[in-house]
Amino acid sequence: TNELLELILKRLKPIAAKKNIELILESFRPVTAEIDETKLTLAISNLVENGIKYNHKNGWVRVSLNADHKYFYVTVADSGMGIPEDSIDHIFERFYRVDKSHSSEIDGTGLGLAITRSAILMHRGAIRVRSKENEGTTFSVRIPLTYIG
C-alpha cells in the first residue's frame, strides 16, 4: 500500500508542478493490505487530483498512510479553496459540481468523487470529509486490511 501511494504521487507530480503545488507523503508504518489495486489507485488518485485541481498556486497536498491491527487509513489534505458547507453533503453524488462558475476553467466529469466513494465502499471502507471554505479540505479513508470482494 505504501508503494501504491508513492506511485500515485510520482505520476501526479508533473501536474502539481505546473501550479507549484507541493505533494507530501507521510507514511507512519509499512502497510500490507488485501486490495483491488486498480480501483484503490483510481480512488486515491481522484482525491489527490482534486487536491491539486482545486488548490491555489504554491499550495500543498499531503497524503498520509497509517494502520492499526484492523484497518489502514489514508488521509488526503490540501490547502485549497475548500468546499462550501451547503455542498458538503452532495459532493459524492454523480455529476455534482460544487462551483459551477469554475467549471469552465476546471476540467472534470463530475464523477470523480462518486467513483472514489464506490471503490472505497467496495473495499468495505468508509470515507469522510472535513472542509472549510478558503482553508482547504481533508478526506479521510478507512479500509479493512483484509477485504474479501
PLM ranges: what are they?
Residues 78:
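Acidic ATP/Mg2+-coordinating residue in the GHKL
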Residues 17-18, 22-31:
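Conserved catalytic submotifs in the C-terminal HATPase_c
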Residues 124-125:
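Conserved glycine-rich
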Residues 83-97:
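Short conserved segment of the HATPase_c
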Residues 1-13, 24:
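A conserved beta-strand-to-alpha-helix junction within the catalytic ATP-binding
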Residues 51-52:
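Short helix-loop "hinge" at the ATP-lid/N-box region of the Bergerat-fold HATPase_c
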Residues 58-70:
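Short beta-strand/loop element within the Bergerat-fold HATPase_c
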